Amino acid sequence: MTAKSVMVLGTTSNAGKSWLTTALCRYYARQGLKVAPYKSQNMSNNARVVVGGEIGSAQYFQALAARAVPDVRMNPLLLKPEKDTQSQVVLMGQVNAELSRMEWRGRSLSVWPVVARALDELLAENDVVVIEGAGSPAEINLKSCDIVNMRVALHANAACLLVTDIDRGGAFAHLYGTWAMLDKTEQQLIRGFVLNKFRGDASLLAPGPQMLQELTGVPTVATLPMWWQHGLPEEDGVFDDRSTAAGAVTQTVAVIAYPRISNLDEFQPLKNVPGVRLKWVRSPSELAGLGPADWVILPGSKATSADLAWLRAQGLDQAIAAHAGRGGAVLGICGGLQMLGEALIDPHGIDGNGPGLGLLPVVTVFDEAKTVQHRQAAFASVGGPWAGLSGVEVQGYEIHHGQTARHSAMAAAGDIACPVMPDGLAWQNAAGNVLGLYLHGMFEDPRVLQALFGAATPTLESVFDGLADYIGQHFEPGVLQSLIA
């Protein structure tokens, strides 16, 4: 079996590559074809656990849309930013310390055989491989070390779509400029232009698409209307004022947006809960007005100690403590759990030592070994605003360094943290309003949403099918089939 390959390129970051790739995966899978996604290199702190290690969340969801088992080959190189100039390198699912220390140009050249082999294997095993590029293929300063855009397209002989965000303005210039900066052999792979996030009367675009085709020979094959609530998380995006489901707002969920936040995509299901508003918080003023029914969430972090220092510098530590002191609900997930404790102890120099926020009487000791695994566990008796979780069994995943345990001195004094999941996976304070857990993905479990909100949200299957229906409606007739002919 030698697969046909379709590749989604973008004129910029956030043009719409990830969701369009996901939509194409489901579109072709619904035809009974064996489909796999692929992105050679992804830079994101949003990761998922699969057999063999971890991959970017976008490729994980794309695999589910393709009705395929997520596989490390679908995202063979994952870069997880730790600092502005430093990333942890995950190669074929596993952290590679040597590559993490390398200069990026040399690293890119050294890993090309690995990422190319992963693609070749997927091409050999499937009918269709839907490939996602990164950023723009016209970054001429990066082209000599490209392992994610046109080098991949040429290797796979992919039929390429070039998508642009028309809502930003300058869409035709973006499309023409990107196309013009490609080599002639690369230009020949571009099969269609896609105008994404369009608002208004599509007839007003004329004569733009026609003139663009005269200049390039490439037709505009789709104009996709703006669609805020397609149901997929932005790969590295944030919530905004549109992050409220239908109905009056009855509860606010405030997520602390520290610089190295990770796995933010796990909060996507909350955007669809009626009456719930999600918002990012970067300053104490944004927590003003929260009531006891409102939540503050400390999400995962790729640099727990550094993000905790940032949180303190903003004054958010005092604002969070004040909310908890009023009986307000506080939830920490993974790195957020570690921050909520009394102390972070780092004997191996992994993340840094320091005091925690002191809202849970627990202590975290960082390990050299990284825990990366799926977990299924049930909550024990849980109190406070989380009482609905009592006895609920949830599926999720762990990605972290470190283990958390009771603070022995505080326990001796009577301030006891209550373990509410086996193996130290989750802890609750005596008052019941502060909960911390290592398990990512809790809100993606319908049982959790039902227990906490009495609400059901759209299933992933319905989201994927909606995406496929959407592109089937808005692409020019026959285009999507011609890409795999």
UniProtKB/Swiss-Prot annotation:
GO BP field: cobalamin biosynthetic process
Active-site residues, record numbering mapped to chain: C334, H440
Pfam families: CbiA (PF01656), GATase_3 (PF07685)
Domain of life, per lineage: Bacteria
Pathway per the UniProt entry: Cofactor biosynthesis; adenosylcobalamin biosynthesis
Residue ranges occupied by any GATase cobBQ-type domain in the UniProt entry: 250-448
SUPFAM superfamilies listed in its UniProt record: Class I glutamine amidotransferase-like, P-loop containing nucleoside triphosphate hydrolases
GO molecular function: ABC-type vitamin B12 transporter activity; catalytic activity
Keywords noted in UniProt: Cobalamin biosynthesis, Glutamine amidotransferase
Annotated InterPro entries: Class_I_gatase-like, CobQ/CobB/MinD/ParA_Nub-bd_dom, CobQ_GATase1, CobQ_N, CobQ_synth, GATase_3, P-loop_NTPase
CDD domains: CobQ_N, GATase1_CobQ
Family per similarity comment: Belongs to the CobB/CobQ family. CobQ subfamily.
Functional summary from the UniProt entry: Catalyzes amidations at positions B, D, E, and G on adenosylcobyrinic A,C-diamide. NH(2) groups are provided by glutamine, and one molecule of ATP is hydrogenolyzed for each amidation.
Name of the protein this chain belongs to: Cobyric acid synthase
